[in-house]
Amino acid sequence: MTHLQAGLSPETLEKARLELNENPDTLHQDIQEVRDMVITRPDIGFLRTDDAFILRFLRARKFHHFEAFRLLAQYFEYRQQNLDMFKSFKATDPGIKQALKDGFPGGLANLDHYGRKILVLFAANWDQSRYTLVDILRAILLSLEAMIEDPELQVNGFVLIIDWSNFTFKQASKLTPSMLRLAIEGLQDSFPARFGGIHFVNQPWYIHALYTVIRPFLKEKTRKRIFLHGNNLNSLHQLIHPEILPSEFGGMLPPYDMGTWARTLLDHEYDDDSEYNVDSYSMPVKEVEKELSPKSMKRSQSVVDPTVLKRMDKNEEENMQPLLSLD
């Protein structure tokens, strides 16, 4: 075991070996292989290339070097292309702070039986007068940044439960194509987290309709991990034991305290210390120690999968139109 695996329990070490192909004997070589690819994307400012940071991406992609680098590139490209989202990217930012206080997201104290962190969202808590959907996405991304520092969660991953109770048609009408795409790109395509399941409960018909619209834009692996339970909490309990769930989900624990995770972040004054601005992303790519092969040096080679969603032009009016009309 190397110092990079110091935070893992023996059980998680074995899981990383069997499920993620993690090998302590080649760990530093694996990391360097990914780091050496940075020079193939001079259009991106890679603000972090340290061992611990790259390791997150290798674990998220089961130590497939090229896939890990593609995710790393998309991580920084997403931030580079959405600079406004990452200005004041900290828990004390007014929009993020209010979203956190309303439980966007929440985090249960107990892990599930696979060691995964359970995140919860109560959609109806969104107060449109105080913060935006983008603020909610920022709060979720900031929370994931804090949680993913735990090496156990890098290996075991997360589960998300979204309760759609009392989420109104008017609120749903704010979910524009551009907003949904921003969320999909940020969470599915650009973040080194392993999501083992996304559970919808108490979803109304119009949320089911929205899911039908966005489903083609989700990766097959993501689609297989989304479960629409409706009002059938028994089906949820077959996948997540009720002993660790709050009463809102038919569990045996007391009602969830919406401010629990917010207090954790605010007490530690957590923020992402990366400088997300135009200057930082225009800095030259750092020199790497090892020379790359001629094939990997081809600058015309893109690491972005052409099947990944093409980013919408923010000026395209149709992308700002609601998927559900109130008319």
Curated annotation (Swiss-Prot):
A Pfam entry, by short name: CRAL_TRIO_N
Entry-linked InterPro entries: CRAL-TRIO_dom, CRAL-TRIO_dom_sf, CRAL/TRIO_N_dom, CRAL/TRIO_N_dom_sf
Subcellular compartments: Golgi apparatus, trans-Golgi network membrane; Cytoplasmic vesicle, Clathrin-coated vesicle; Early endosome membrane
Name listed for the protein in its UniProt record: Clavesin-2
Keyword match Membrane: yes
Organism of derivation: Homo sapiens (Human)
Membrane topology designation: Peripheral membrane protein
Record key words, sorted: Cytoplasmic vesicle, Endosome, Golgi apparatus, Lipid-binding, Membrane, Phosphoprotein
Signal peptide coordinates: none
Domain notes: The CRAL-TRIO domain is required for targeting to the membrane and for binding PtdIns(3,5)P2.
Classification via PANTHER family: ALPHA-TOCOPHEROL TRANSFER PROTEIN-RELATED, CLAVESIN-2
GO term, biological process aspect, one: lysosome organization
Additional information: Binding to PtdIns(3,5)P2 is not required for localization.
